[in-house]
Amino acid sequence: MEARTTDLSDLYPEGEALPMVFKSFGGRARFAGRVRTLRVFEDNALVRKVLEEEGAGQVLFVDGGGSLRTALLGGNLARLAWERGWAGVVVHGAVRDTEELRGVPIGLLALAATPKKSAKEGKGEVDVPLKVLGVEVLPGSFLLADEDGLLLLPEPPSGVRSGG
């Protein structure tokens, strides 16, 4: 990803912006890709199930309700995401294994880290519209992330490709 979210936001005013309240935990601070969505609460079984699919440069956006009590992604799932070709994962919630996450060469954003693991019951919804920080996150939209924030567009901007 070469273009900056600030420049693209100016060029595409129809884009939705999420402020950088997220912390970067992965090996890449800048990444972009088509969005897959997931809504869960303190249960990461569906996170694993989706990340086991071929990522093809997509970004998984996980709405964990902003809960910081349990981690929805750790080192094992981050490595799985990288091995399956995901460009990144955004977690509106917490992660763990932060030292391991830094070594995985994809974008990994979350609100915070916590040592506590999540439930594994498989509760949640896949590929549904999300509302995070007042912004609608739609499956199939295009997400660009860098140090200035996250930008959601209906289609990829000219010259921007998925990946890091």
Curated annotation (Swiss-Prot):
Catalytic activity, reaction form: 4-hydroxy-4-methyl-2-oxoglutarate = 2 pyruvate; oxaloacetate + H(+) = pyruvate + CO2
Protein name: Putative 4-hydroxy-4-methyl-2-oxoglutarate aldolase
InterPro entries for the chain: RraA, RraA/RraA-like, RraA/RraA-like_sf
Entry keyword set: Lyase, Metal-binding
CDD domains: RraA_family (cd16841)
Organism placement in taxonomy: Bacteria, Thermotogati, Deinococcota, Deinococci, Thermales
Function: Catalyzes the aldol cleavage of 4-hydroxy-4-methyl-2-oxoglutarate (HMG) into 2 molecules of pyruvate. Also contains a secondary oxaloacetate (OAA) decarboxylase activity due to the common pyruvate enolate transition state formed following C-C bond cleavage in the retro-aldol and decarboxylation reactions.
Residues annotated to bind substrate: G74, G75, N76, L77, R96
Binding residue positions for a divalent metal cation: D97
Enzyme class: lyase
Family, similarity comment: Belongs to the class II aldolase/RraA-like family.
Swiss-Prot/TrEMBL GO biological process terms: regulation of RNA metabolic process
GO MF, one annotated term: 4-hydroxy-4-methyl-2-oxoglutarate aldolase activity
Family matches, as Gene3D superfamilies: Ribonuclease E inhibitor RraA/RraA-like (3.50.30.40)
A Pfam family annotated for this UniProt entry: RraA-like
SUPFAM superfamilies xrefs: RraA-like (SSF89562)
Cofactor requirements of the protein: a divalent metal cation
EC number(s) recorded for this UniProt protein: 4.1.3.17, 4.1.1.112
Cofactor binding mode and count: Divalent metal cation.
Subunit description: Homotrimer.
